[in-house]
Amino acid sequence: MLLPFQVTKNITLLGSELFNLYLVKGETYAIVEGAVSGITYPFLEQLDQLNVPPEAISHLVILHSHFDHMMVFPTLKGRYPWMKIVSSDLNRAIFTSERTLAKIFDSDRKITLALKERGIISEAPNLHPPTFFPLDITVQEGSVLDLGKGMKMEYLEIPGHSPDCLGAFLESEGVLFCSDGAGFYTPPDFFRPNYWYRLDEAEKSIDKMKAIDPDILCRGHYGAMIGKDLARKHLQMNRQSIEDFKAYVLEKINEGYSVEEITQDVTLRFSKGFLELFPPEQNYRLWKLLIQRTLEHFGIEMEER
């Protein structure tokens, strides 16, 4: 899929295959999803290619506060302060925590370095952790961002992957932006769960998105799933991946495997696609957390060996 890619008349997919941003056109423009800082310069070139001036962009939408969904925005906000950052009300605490922001910016720096080492990008902004990250507009379940010309973006809370994870539904386009709320996907057909926060909330969130039944599902990685059948397939496959993982963890526990042994197996099998850019120790930590969340769901306590 060559980028920029026209998803609908009013929505354009930008960024890269691995890290997506969406340009949404109303009377003004919004950018949904913020990718990593390494995508900043290619993204700005794409805007120029589309003849979209910065003055036309009014809102920058962060659907959850993980570094790989927000780090193009520091440069944009610094250059163009009229752009308003939109995110969950839960992020007031995160965006004012120097310690948390330092971790976010450090993770972004590591991924940017990996992108350079692999020749995916040649340069990137040199960002330094701020004392706070701006949050101009907070949203919650049922909030609406009206961009004009019928482009009303309604927000839904879809926790599970993270407590602050949001979806955004544009009914006029039949488009649901799900960020990472619908699990991880790597083309062509590899689905796996990502409930770092809570398993039961992840299940409810996917069921909520299935009830919306969008025509198009826009992910934060690997682009837009166009067509109701494909959107349904993606939501169902990610829902099934949760069930499969629950069964897998229970089976391994019953066979006497330790959390560390299960984590080693999962890390090897699940760290595919854009996750290959992550440091190995970070992937290990994330998949161990997924296993721990699964055990918590079942009320199983295990001592580490």
Q: Where would I find each of the regions flagged by the language model?
A:
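Conserved beta-strand hairpin/beta-sheet module of binuclear metal-dependent hydrolase folds
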Residues: 1-50, 167-180
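C-terminal regulatory/interaction regions
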Residues: 249-305
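Metallo-beta-lactamase
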Residues: 36-38, 152-236
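Residue-level marker for buried hydrophobic side chains located in beta-strands
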Residues: 30, 61, 85, 175-177, ...
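Active-site HxH/HxHxD metal-binding segment of metal-dependent hydrolases
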Residues: 49-143
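C-terminal functional module detector
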Residues: 233-251
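A short catalytic or substrate-binding loop motif that flags glycine-/basic-rich loops and adjacent residues
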Residues: 14-16, 137-139, 159-162
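Divalent metal-coordination and catalytic microenvironments
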Residues: 10, 24, 33, 64, ...
